[in-house]
Amino acid sequence: MGQKVNPIGIRLGIIKDWNSKWFAGKRYAEFLIQDIKLRSDLKKKLMAAAVSKILIERPANNAVVTILTARPGVIIGKKGGGIETLRKEISDSLGVPVHLNIEEVKKPELDATLVAEGIAQQLEQRVMFRRAMKRAVTSALKAGAKGIKICVSGRLGGAEIARSEWYREGRVPLHTFRADIDYGTAESKTTYGIIGVKVWIFKGEILPQKKRSTESAQ
């Protein structure tokens, strides 16, 4: 049976970039565990801030952490107090001086992770899954998406037997590497169990950088 590869992982080095950028040698495992723990802790701590991505770079003996969020004001706090506290916490966690950047996600309707988390939250509030899916699809297409696909799996509506439901609108060409496809997942913890949410959003096509530069040179 055919399985689907992660659409972001397969495009790394073509049109997508890595979320962690560093070279570690023998300390690879240590750095990887630090990154995973930091992302997990920040996601829990900043749940109200609608965090999309956390980018980590480690140049020389320091670190640069960039948080992409739909609500930067929640993280920054009054007079920037929240951001300084957060920077100290991250610095203690990584054990090196940290430079912290906060970037705003201009269109959260086109961010697959935020869309998936939005649907998961609605399911926890007992909104009908079809209504939550349809609302997300309509918002994404209004915001300029070329296509969107959503899958929710689990005991939908409290059913005895778990199943998967799909909703798709527009084009989502997973096999086209130049297609800019954002992918995000979330879990909804309901009284009947966990419901998994997956979202694919097609934003248009991008020419890989090398190809674009050679074409402009010609």
From Swiss-Prot:
Name the PANTHER family for this protein: 30S/40S RIBOSOMAL PROTEIN S3, SMALL RIBOSOMAL SUBUNIT PROTEIN US3C
Q: How does it assemble?
A: Part of the 30S ribosomal subunit. Forms a tight complex with proteins S10 and S14.
Quote the PROSITE patterns the UniProt record gives: KH_TYPE_2, RIBOSOMAL_S3
Please state every residue range assigned to the domain named KH type-2.
Answer: 38-106
User: What's the protein called, per UniProt?
Assistant: Small ribosomal subunit protein uS3
- A Pfam family this chain is assigned to: Ribosomal_S3_C
- Signal peptide as annotated in the record: none
* Organism this protein belongs to: Legionella pneumophila (strain Lens)
Cysteine pairs forming cystine bridges in this chain are none
Q: Write down the InterPro entries for this protein, in alphabetical order.
A: KH_dom (IPR004087), KH_dom-like_a/b (IPR015946), KH_dom_type_2 (IPR004044), KH_sf_prok-type (IPR009019), Ribosomal_S3_C_sf (IPR036419), Ribosomal_uS3_bac-typ (IPR005704), Ribosomal_uS3_C (IPR001351), Ribosomal_uS3_CS (IPR018280)
BP GO terms, sorted: translation
Q: What does this protein do?
A: Binds the lower part of the 30S subunit head. Binds mRNA in the 70S ribosome, positioning it for translation.
